[in-house]
């Protein structure tokens, strides 16, 4: 236990904090005169003032004190900034410890470099205002609020020497994801994982309102934290030296508490038995906009919502410009920097060195630590195939065997985890429980299964937390897979959107190394949620992902189990992408053997010769993307053989949806010649699609004669019904596809009225049978592939 702090040490801490605050204000306001070598003029001030001051002094306070803790105890600490709008504070800290200059040599540690540091902030073609990938030491931008604590816990998993300090703004604490994130402590194994120190910063206000947790009593807040399973430590005040003293002492106590928890767990007699500890949480209460202007134009600013962004605006008013000068001078920069603008040596000595610096922590640049997974060869798990449509299998159950051995092969390296919101078994991935369990540190009943403190499957009924854990795990250099019901992935589609923005920006930062891809398996999908109904039926994530940058977005729709295996192996090997795989879990007919699946998935799209009757030039192309659309297309082919056997039909299956785009638009896109080689230039195309039809039209709109594409897909008709009726009510069924052929092949026009009559008679028969028997007609339920190729 440290005997800190003495008066001299307190003054040094305060000086360092003042230096960070000075650099923070300078970034927000100044474009020149960085060291105040003369009185400020309007020319020294940026013409557009952008940035957030209110949270920044609190961030600088915490960061400064963590530096002291790291320095004293040689700790490995990762800093996660929940209120990411305090970006200038984190840039200031990286500049003070030297990391920023090491990575950006033009921003030197002198007056010229300081001026560049100031000018670039929130400046066109400079750097952004939040704690994005451009900020050394960051894994969390903190723009969209709610995810900081889940990211922090994801980073701590399997990192036993790491402490993740996560600052949570009191505004962010009101979000749903953050509220659920407090439960993450129940999944952290102190014997194997690192520690997370949540730091709840109560500065009282959001943009324009008081924050909830800052206004409740200390007794109520203490009860809340105890109820979540934390041991709360309070530090509060508005007098700097008193706060420095209290915070330093409290952090020493907290570190000793963390060390004690970990020692007890790591040297226990039975390492399999781990009692869930009461982890510490720091609750820090300081004024919003602390050390900034107390009053502006007669209105209180410091300690109020008015300090959230710019305490001083309209600097063309001389009193405001004078107040800015006084504000900057209050930090006494001449006591902090020498005449050349370099931080004084006695202050620079307060920072940790090398990788101990939080801004240089390699865990914040996870690609540096990333090791490839030891992947088994997926061909060893393929479904044996005597021929197309001869055997049935559950695609995700087959994948489960593969994932089991991915997990098994990674047990020693501890760099792979499986995540899901209480759905691993439901999604047929439960073979993984042959080699590991679900993480669980609390009480359990005698008939509970597959629960242990050593488990590597993360399940909590919160898609937000699963996604946040996985992102934190990936960003710190590991691998993972998130399986989720397709409809409920929308709960986190905004998180996925934010991760895409991070990846896009990180790829533009030269010193950032690529991380493992975000791999999402969507199952229990729209066409097989007939038992749960409309609320569980939504394929819309595909539309969202298709809007992302072409060098990030990947959408895969494997038609069967062997294709799913091929796609999954590819995704687990990949780097820097968001891979979404949509696959069913129900028993379905299988189409391609292992070798054919490998070739098909490598191409991403292809003509299925064994299903075609096109004699080189078809009269119609039947295309499909997704397992159920593939089934319905092949069933339509067999019906067409019965009713119009001489029609030349081509079947094209799409696994990689982005192959439909132009090669100039997407790296997986087909050239026009290859596209026309599959779809022709002028023949009608009937496209059965897993998702919303408009997405296909968007992807192919620049292709030859796009108006000839007629797309069937989900049209927002859902119910609790049978699997086939789901296709019927959305006009994706085989009988509708058959009618589409008659309507679009010119020489079949004389038979069109007869075809329509057959269609409506079949629909009436289907509905009556369904109502009477509650199941699909025998000709549907017992259908099998029987067509023989003439190709």
From Swiss-Prot:
Top EC class, one word: lyase
Superkingdom of origin organism: Bacteria
Keyword Lyase tagged: yes
Any one GO BP annotation for this protein: carbohydrate metabolic process
EC number, as in UniProt: 4.1.2.-
Pfam families: XFP (PF03894), XFP_C (PF09363), XFP_N (PF09364)
Cofactor(s) it depends on: thiamine diphosphate
Entry's Gene Ontology molecular function annotations: aldehyde-lyase activity
Cytoplasm in keyword set: no
Assigned keywords, A-Z: Lyase, Thiamine pyrophosphate
SUPFAM superfamilies linked: Thiamin diphosphate-binding fold (THDP-binding), TK C-terminal domain-like
PROSITE patterns: PHOSPHOKETOLASE_1, PHOSPHOKETOLASE_2
Family statement: Belongs to the XFP family.
Protein name stated in the entry: Probable phosphoketolase
């Amino acid at each position: 236990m440290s005997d800190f702090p003495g008066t001299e040490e307190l003054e040094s801490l305060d000086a360092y904090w003042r230096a960070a605050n000075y650099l923070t204000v300078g970034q927000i306001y100044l474009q020149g005169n960085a060291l105040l070598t003369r009185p400020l003029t309007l020319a020294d001030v940026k013409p557009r003032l952008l940035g957030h001051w209110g949270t920044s002094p609190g961030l600088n306070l915490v960061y400064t004190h963590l530096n002291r803790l790291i320095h004293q105890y040689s700790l490995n600490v990762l800093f996660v900034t929940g209120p990411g709008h305090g970006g200038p504070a984190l840039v200031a800290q990286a500049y003070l410890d030297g990391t920023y200059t090491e990575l950006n040599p033009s921003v030197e540690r002198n007056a010229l470099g300081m001026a560049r540091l100031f000018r670039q902030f929130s400046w066109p073609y400079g750097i952004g205002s939040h704690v994005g990938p451009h900020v050394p030491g960051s894994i969390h931008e903190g723009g969209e609020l709610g995810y900081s604590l889940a990211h922090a816990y994801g980073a701590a998993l399997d990192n036993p020497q790491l402490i993740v300090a996560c600052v949570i703004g009191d505004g962010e604490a009101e979000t749903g994801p953050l509220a659920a994130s407090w439960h993450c402590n129940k999944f952290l194994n102190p014997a194997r994982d690192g520690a997370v120190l949540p730091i709840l910063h109560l500065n009282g206000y959001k943009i324009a309102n008081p924050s909830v947790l800052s206004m409740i009593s200390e007794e109520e807040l203490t009860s809340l934290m105890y109820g979540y399973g934390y041991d709360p430590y309070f530090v509060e005040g508005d007098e700097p030296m008193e706060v420095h003293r209290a915070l330093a002492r409290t952090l020493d106590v907290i570190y000793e508490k963390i060390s004690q928890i970990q020692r007890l767990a790591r040297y226990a007699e039975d390492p399999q038995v781990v009692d869930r500890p009461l982890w510490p949480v720091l609750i820090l209460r300081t004024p919003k906009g602390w050390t900034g202007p107390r009053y502006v134009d007669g209105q209180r600013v410091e300690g109020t919502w008015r300090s959230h962004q710019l305490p001083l605006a309209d600097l063309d008013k001389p009193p405001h410009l004078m107040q800015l000068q006084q504000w900057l001078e209050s930090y006494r920069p001449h006591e902090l920097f020498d005449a050349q603008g370099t931080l004084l040596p006695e202050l620079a000595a307060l920072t940790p060195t090398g990788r101990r610096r939080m801004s240089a922590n390699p865990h914040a640049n996870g690609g540096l630590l990333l090791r490839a997974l030891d992947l088994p060869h997926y061909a060893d798990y393929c479904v044996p195939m005597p021929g197309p449509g001869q055997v049935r299998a559950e695609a995700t159950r087959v994948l489960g065997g593969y994932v089991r051995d991915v997990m098994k092969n990674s047990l020693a390296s501890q760099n792979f985890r499986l995540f899901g919101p209480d759905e691993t078994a439901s999604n047929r991935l439960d073979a993984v429980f042959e080699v590991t369990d679900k993480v669980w540190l609390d009480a359990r009943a005698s008939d509970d299964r597959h629960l242990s403190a050593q488990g590597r499957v993360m399940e909590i009924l919160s898609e937000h937390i699963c996604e946040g854990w996985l992102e934190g795990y990936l960003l710190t250099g590991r691998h993972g897979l998130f399986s989720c019901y397709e409809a409920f992935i929308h709960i986190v589609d905004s998180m996925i959107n934010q991760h895409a923005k991070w990846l896009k920006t990180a790829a533009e930062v030269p010193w950032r190394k690529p991380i493992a891809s975000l791999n999402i398996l969507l199952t229990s999908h729209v066409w097989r949620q007939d038992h749960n109904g409309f609320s569980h039926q939504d394929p819309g994530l595909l539309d969202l992902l298709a809007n992302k940058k072409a060098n990030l977005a990947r959408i895969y729709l494997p038609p069967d189990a062997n294709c799913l295996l091929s796609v999954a192996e590819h995704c687990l090997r990949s780097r820097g992408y968001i891979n979404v795989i949509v696959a069913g879990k129900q028993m379905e007919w299988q189409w391609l053997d292992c070798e054919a699946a490998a070739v098909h998935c490598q191409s991403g799209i292809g003509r299925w010769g064994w299903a075609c009757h096109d004699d080189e030039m078809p009269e119609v192309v039947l295309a499909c993307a997704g397992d159920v659309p593939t089934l319905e297309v092949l069933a339509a082919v067999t019906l067409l053989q019965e009713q119009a056997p001489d029609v030349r039909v081509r079947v094209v299956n799409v696994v990689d949806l982005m192959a439909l785009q132009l090669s100039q638009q997407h790296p997986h896109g087909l050239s026009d010649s290859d596209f026309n080689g599959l779809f022709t230039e002028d023949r009608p195309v009937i496209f059965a699609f897993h998702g919303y039809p408009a997405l296909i039209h968007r992807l192919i709109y620049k292709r030859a004669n796009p108006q000839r594409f007629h797309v069937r897909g989900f049209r927002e008709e859902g119910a609790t019904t049978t699997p086939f009726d789901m296709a019927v009510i959305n006009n994706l069924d085989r009988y509708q596809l058959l009618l589409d052929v008659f309507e679009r092949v010119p020489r079949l026009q004389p038979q069109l009225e007869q075809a329509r009559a057959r269609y409506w008679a079949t629909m009436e028969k289907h509905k009556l049978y369904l109502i009477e028997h509650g199941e699909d007609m025998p000709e549907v339920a017992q259908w099998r592939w029987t067509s023989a190729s003439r190709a």
